[in-house]
Amino acid sequence: MKFTATQIAEILDGKVEGNPEAEVSELAKIEEGSEGSLTFLSNPKYTSFLYTTNASVTIVNDDFEVEQPVNTTLIKVKDAYKAFSTLLEYYNQIKLNKSGIEQPSHISESAKYGEGLYLGAFAYIGENVSIGENVKIYPNVYIGDNVKIGNNVTLFPGVKVYSESLIGSEVTIHSGVVIGADGFGFSPGDTGEYSKVPQIGNVIIEDYVDIGAGTTIDRATLGSTIIRKGAKLDNHIQIAHNVEIGENTAIAAQTGIAGSTKIGKNCLIGGQVGIAGHLTIGNRVKIQAQSGIGRDIKDDEMLQGSPAIGYSDYNKSYIHFKNLPKTMNIIHQLEKKINNG
């Protein structure tokens, strides 16, 4: 699909400088732009590429002034980076604008779905499932009984949603995600064997949540495991039974959160963080990668290390840690002097 500079400017509320009929059919980085591509410039570090790019159209900030002739048509907007992000989203919507029901697939007679459904081949929809409008369900997705899904939700290939799970609107769930599998609940017996504790709760995913590939979110033992509105989860995260993730909290890959821990709003959690169970983590907390959390955390704390301590304390301690060989050498020299009298 092709767009002219004028059409793009209308979408972005921008102003064209150059050829208004310049056509583009793809997006590219400014240093790799070719004829027919659209790119953007927002970081001054890349300004030199504007004068060498072969891109047909380039989005720039409205206060940008060229210092020499350019071969690309400019579209001036208030915020070039944000405008390009808008186009990426628009492009993605066009690319993913599938509809219809492919065969073979299965929809239970008691299931209900809204307009604009796309159901890929070998997908399965169980009994009493409710699906909203404009939902895209890609091949090999499994949706168990009594699941409810809102509007404008995308489930990429291979997603598994166990029974009773509730998914809001504007949610994106990437390939390989498992929602609602049993939590890790086992009761030790007197002779060392384990008995399984039935997990009869569910999972609730609120609106505007994004879940990365391979992430697993276990159902609650009782009640609900909850991912609040706007949370962003990276790939390969393990969220255990009865965990609650607060609104607009972002968690990087390979983090594991043990059962019944509550995490507040607007937290940032780095990759490979381990969080013990039954903890309360406040709002706006920042946890650096590979940290180990074993205690409750107050609002606005910044932590690093395993076990995690305050970020500034960690940096001070690390300086001393790096100097340990030198410090030990000094101590040995002093010991020799003392022992030799």
Swiss-Prot record:
Q: Which GO terms describe its biological process?
A: lipid A biosynthetic process
Q: Which domain of life is it from?
A: Bacteria
Q: Does the keyword Transcription apply?
A: no
**E.C. numbers:** 2.3.1.191
Which PROSITE patterns does the UniProt entry name for this protein? HEXAPEP_TRANSFERASES (PS00101)
Query: Which Pfam family name is an example for this entry?
Result: LpxD
User: What reaction gets catalysed by this protein?
Assistant: a UDP-3-O-[(3R)-3-hydroxyacyl]-alpha-D-glucosamine + a (3R)-hydroxyacyl-[ACP] = a UDP-2-N,3-O-bis[(3R)-3-hydroxyacyl]-alpha-D-glucosamine + holo-[ACP] + H(+)
Identify the metabolic or biological route this protein is part of.
Answer: Bacterial outer membrane biogenesis; LPS lipid A biosynthesis
Catalytic site positions:
H241
Citing just one GO molecular function, the answer is:
N-acyltransferase activity
Q: Name one GO cellular component term.
A: membrane
Indicate the enzyme's highest-level EC class: transferase
Task: Give the InterPro entries listed for this entry.
Answer: Hexapep (IPR001451), Hexapep_transf_CS (IPR018357), LpxD (IPR007691), Trimer_LpxA-like_sf (IPR011004), UDP_GlcNAc_AcTrfase_non-rep (IPR020573)
Keyword Lipid metabolism included in the entry's annotation: yes
Keyword terms of this UniProt record: Acyltransferase, Lipid A biosynthesis, Lipid biosynthesis, Lipid metabolism, Repeat, Transferase
Q: Which NCBIfam families does the protein's record reference?
A: lipid_A_lpxD, PRK00892.1
Per UniProt, subunit arrangement is: Homotrimer.
State the protein's purpose: Catalyzes the N-acylation of UDP-3-O-acylglucosamine using 3-hydroxyacyl-ACP as the acyl donor. Is involved in the biosynthesis of lipid A, a phosphorylated glycolipid that anchors the lipopolysaccharide to the outer membrane of the cell.
> Which family, according to UniProt?
Belongs to the transferase hexapeptide repeat family. LpxD subfamily.
Q: What is this protein called?
A: UDP-3-O-acylglucosamine N-acyltransferase
Originating species: Christiangramia forsetii (strain DSM 17595 / CGMCC 1.15422 / KT0803)
- What gene does this protein come from? lpxD
